[in-house]
């Protein structure tokens, strides 16, 4: 499903006080600073095997929201996984945790937002959950809803709105 990008500030103006605007302050780390698409989710803690498996599938222009528990101890995404996501048609990644290879990520045509960076690799046991509601910064990211992301922040709109 292709979603036309709209600036988050315009969405806030149009939707009004009930807007689902994420309060968490993510760093813009990917080469694409504006992205939008249907949400898929992964919840994993310091383990990126499930995340890599999901990004190995066709993304269809989607946005993968990753709840890493806010951990900055290990990176959940690096250049190899980000390139896998880009090659499989994902529009962007929103990571409640750390990423690595930030210089390489800036040169890739994919959106990547994360709390920060850490060069340490994560474990690879496959622990985690997929396609579950994830609440970050006062907003629930529900699979199938639409995420819009730019330099101003992240807004979530219910599918069909």
From Swiss-Prot:
Q: What class of enzyme is it?
A: lyase
Could you provide one GO biological process annotation from this protein's UniProt record?
Answer: regulation of RNA metabolic process
Name the Gene3D superfamilies on file: Ribonuclease E inhibitor RraA/RraA-like
Q: How is the cofactor bound?
A: Divalent metal cation.
User: Matching InterPro entries, A to Z?
Assistant: RraA, RraA/RraA-like, RraA/RraA-like_sf
Q: Specify which residues bind substrate according to the UniProt entry for this protein.
A: 78-81, 100
Q: Which residues bind a divalent metal cation?
A: 101
Q: Which UniProt keywords apply?
A: Lyase, Metal-binding
Q: Which reaction does it catalyse?
A: 4-hydroxy-4-methyl-2-oxoglutarate = 2 pyruvate; oxaloacetate + H(+) = pyruvate + CO2
Tell me which domain of life the UniProt entry assigns to the organism this sequence originates from: Bacteria
Task: Identify the EC number(s).
Answer: 4.1.3.17, 4.1.1.112
Q: Name one Pfam family in it.
A: RraA-like
Q: Please verify whether the record's keywords include Aminoacyl-tRNA synthetase.
A: no
One MF annotation (Gene Ontology) recorded for this entry: 4-hydroxy-4-methyl-2-oxoglutarate aldolase activity
Cofactor(s) in the UniProt record: a divalent metal cation
Quaternary structure and interacting proteins, as annotated: Homotrimer.
Q: Which family does it belong to?
A: Belongs to the class II aldolase/RraA-like family.
Write out the function statement from the record. Answer: Catalyzes the aldol cleavage of 4-hydroxy-4-methyl-2-oxoglutarate (HMG) into 2 molecules of pyruvate. Also contains a secondary oxaloacetate (OAA) decarboxylase activity due to the common pyruvate enolate transition state formed following C-C bond cleavage in the retro-aldol and decarboxylation reactions.
This protein is called Putative 4-hydroxy-4-methyl-2-oxoglutarate aldolase
């Amino acid at each position: 499903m292709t979603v036309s990008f709209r600036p988050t500030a315009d969405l806030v103006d149009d939707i009004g006080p009930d807007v689902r605007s994420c309060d968490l302050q993510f760093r813009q780390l990917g080469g694409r600073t504006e992205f939008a698409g249907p949400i898929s989710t992964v919840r994993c803690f310091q383990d990126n095997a499930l995340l890599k498996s999901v990004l190995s599938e066709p993304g269809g222009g989607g946005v993968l929201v990753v709840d890493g528990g806010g951990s900055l101890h290990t990176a959940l995404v690096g250049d190899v996984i980000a390139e896998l996501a880009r090659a499989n048609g994902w529009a962007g990644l929103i990571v409640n945790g750390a990423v690595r290879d930030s210089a390489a990520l800036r040169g890739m045509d994919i959106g990547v937002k994360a709390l920060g960076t850490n060069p340490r690799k994560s474990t690879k046991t496959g622990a985690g959950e997929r396609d579950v509601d994830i609440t970050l910064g006062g907003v629930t990211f529900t699979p199938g809803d639409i995420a819009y992301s730019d330099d101003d922040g992240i807004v979530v709109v219910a599918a069909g709105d």
